[in-house]
Amino acid sequence: MHNYRLYYKKLSRWHDPEQVFPALYADKKYTFWLDNKDFSYMGIASKRIKYSISNHALSISDNNKTQKLRQNIFTYLQKELLSWKGVASVGIPVERPQPPLRRSQSPWGGSEDVGLGKRETGPLFNFTGGFVGYFGYEMKAECDCLSLRGGQSRRSNPVKNCKTQRDCHAHPLSGFARNDKKKPDAYLFFVDKFLAFDHQQKCLYLVALSENKKEADQWFSATTIKLSNLTSNFSTFDFRLSTFDSPLTFTPSQSRQQYIKNIRTCQKYLIQGDAYQICLTNQITADIKIDWLVLYRTLRAANPAPFNAYINFGNFALLSSSPEQFLQVDKEGWVTGKPMKGTVRRGDTRKKDLRLAGRLGKTEKDYAENIMIVDLVRNDLGKICEFGSIKVTKPLEVQTYATVHQLVSTIKGKLRPETNIIDLLQAAFPGGSMTGTPKIAACGIIAELEKTPRGIYSGTFGFLSLNGTANLAMTIRTIIADKEKLSFGAGGAILTDSVPQEEYEEMLLKAQPLITSIVKTTGAKTFHLNF
């Protein structure tokens, strides 16, 4: 057990996170900004945990040294979370009365009451320090996806019948070449000092895990001074970095012809009964050197989403405007999953927009696409949740974003007392909305047709908190930025009644806000979709 306490201080003055992050962290590596309209968190890693599934290589680094182990990352995380269990919270009195009683609810945040003039008994938000980062899609090799417990088709052995048993079950990388060494299969920061922004109440908290109050106070004082020196210069922002003279080219891993051919191949497997639904995706790249933070700020303005995020891993970064929640765990052990299946573009007039949204979920295809994945998520949660606790609380809800309407269902369940977020993650990963169903068979077909690793795309990112809570988003609508290259994925669910050309256009529709943000940031006069 660690002899640490959680110290937090509520500041009397509000600061906009879009001003704070560039001022405190723009010139630093290993930083994060989990960012949305209700709660945001930002800070810098005190440790970095990287993992490769090909040889079970786990590395743990801080500023002074790197420790290398042969250990499964889930085993490591189980031990770490257990060792931090029971860390007490210590609040530093604020300079003014607390706001009136309210209950906050946020994609990234928590839900705890605060009374007028009362001292807080704990932070209002769920993240109290812990792990921030991602698990890439290929981490499925160490989850229940590669166990026959992961799902059944109407045939006795969906893995055998999908003709890709080696790809989806036997080989740890699902038949693919090894991932880019610069991008681990999983990469997490350990975070013990961070800022938490409550956007609803315009409150800013400084939070520190420390063995003594003096160390926490020193960090509070230093950070408060930096915040007090902020100017208004960051409030105005030129989204265009520079004029990009050459035509900007976006290149997919599958051409239009190949993607449509793969859709038809998926449908053959579906008709044979090897699967019910397959999520086929495409990877798109652009060779360009660009300021990652400038691009992220362009993306968050153009395509605001429940799970915006910027995570700088040093030699690459994750820039996300993900709309989809994978898994959330609250302080009472309640799990929420919100699979997103069913998409339609926005209308160019209000009347047309409402009509398109109204139709979503009412067609047989949209309904089937969503409900199949709801059943899959219920099955995944059933491995780890209390019997009888799993409920579909909000089926087939239409949610609207900048470029699309999406069909979302909400499933809840209660974790069994002997389980935690790591058990849940291994039971449910990868998210069924990005595989299809049955999960094992769908993963095998995906491996056969896509032929390249998905990498970070279609995995999950977010936080695992030391207090047992977690919030993880699906890694979609997300740019992975290298020093001189950008990449992102897009795709959709294939059913027997899918129209191949329409599925291809839906893939492009989902890629549109990412392409638009890149073009806007570069100031490119022309761009080419090399599809």
Located regions from the model:
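A cross-taxon signal for low-complexity, glycine/charged-rich
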Residues: V90-G122, Q152-Q165, H171-L173, A177-D180, ...
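Extended alpha-helical targeting/anchoring segments
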Residues: M1-V87, G122-S147, D180-R240, F244-F531
